[in-house]
Design a protein with these regions (language model features):
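A structural signal for conserved, well-ordered secondary-structure elements
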Residues: 1-324
Length: 324
């Protein structure tokens, strides 16, 4: 006998429109609050978007990121990212790392004195360490990177909306677009509110959120389209409720199992990936909410073309019967 885990019963009868004005008000408030927080606080941009200096290290000993970080802590450098670099072409005693130091406000790059202090601190940890290269990225290049990230998110939103429009109708595309903008905006608002570091990995997380959220939304929309053809005389609101209830078990199971893995990474993954994992974790929660409450509400308010209500075939037949 097979054992099946069920977080939600297969057949539910929840009225998801019962609190539609409350959920609409909540979503509107959170979106507007996110805009205000983004305007007042701004995002805490990481090295990728602020510019800074990258010091490449090479040693015959294994890279100890924790020891490197501890050695640099007394220097009060601010935002420092230390990553080990792997490459199949490296030799057995070639251990490479990158130390990325964010530029201070108003500065083009880290000063040579600071670079010398960093190199001296790392040499105390590993006397065999060398520094093959030191590269700096100014604010202009970082500003271009910010715009590229904005274009990437905007292009993703446009492409997803176009796909939904082709597969369903324009009302569904608008519902999906509003839902996705809602998810991204609120996630960025949380990052601005708590001043969580916002870097390229966060952009990757936002794009992941878009894909995950639209996946849930498409599942609901696909079931809605099937039920619209199946229950042609049922009111649209009831068909939507039925469709969400029929897909609820799948939605909760998928999101729940994903969140279990993400929470484990959030707690045990360390500082390097914490921002990325937090963005995806929060985005999946808000994306599941928007798939159930935001996207379908927009479709309901815009209305959906219902062939059964217009009955064009019967009208044409009546015209032929009445013709002389």
């Amino acid at each position: 006998m097979a054992f099946r885990l069920k977080l939600v019963p297969e057949k539910t009868n929840i009225d998801f429109f019962r609190w539609q004005f409350l959920t609409f008000g909540l979503s509107t408030f959170l979106a507007l609050a996110s805009i205000v927080v983004l305007f007042l606080n701004g995002l805490n941009f990481g090295i990728d978007f602020r510019g800074g200096t990258t010091i490449r290290t090479e040693s015959t000993q294994s890279v100890d990121v924790g020891a490197y970080r501890e050695a640099l802590q007394p220097l009060n450098l601010g935002d420092v990212a230390i990553t080990e670099v792997f490459d199949p072409t490296f030799g057995p005693e070639q251990n490479v790392a990158q130390v990325r130091i964010s530029a201070q406000d108003g500065a083009e790059a880290v000063t040579p004195e600071t670079v010398n202090a960093v190199e001296a601190a790392l040499q105390e940890v590993d006397p065999s360490i060398t520094f093959p290269s030191v590269e700096s990225v100014g604010p202009k290049v970082s500003g271009e990177l910010v715009m590229t990230a904005v274009y990437a998110v905007a292009a993703s939103l446009a492409a997803i909306s176009f796909y939904i429009w082709l597969r369903f109708e324009w009302q569904f595309a608008m519902g999906a677009l509003v839902s996705l903008v809602h998810d991204v905006l609120i996630t960025m608002g949380v990052f601005a509110l708590f001043q969580i570091k916002f870097d390229l990995t966060t952009i990757a997380a936002l794009l992941t959120i878009l894909g995950y959220s639209i996946n849930d939304t498409v599942v609901v929309f696909d079931r809605l389209r099937e039920n619209l053809m199946k229950y042609k005389k049922m009111p649209l609101r009831e068909v939507m409720n039925l469709s969400v209830n029929e897909t609820l078990s799948r939605t909760v199971m998928t999101s729940g199992t994903t969140l279990i893995a993400l929470i484990a990474l959030l707690v045990l993954g360390g500082d390097v990936i914490r921002g990325f994992v937090f963005a995806i974790t929060f985005g999946i929660v808000i994306g599941t909410y928007s798939s159930v409450y935001v996207a379908k509400n927009v479709v309901l308010w815009l209305g959906v073309k219902r062939d059964w209500s217009k009955q064009p075939t019967d009208e044409v037949a009546a015209q032929f019967r009445d013709a002389p």
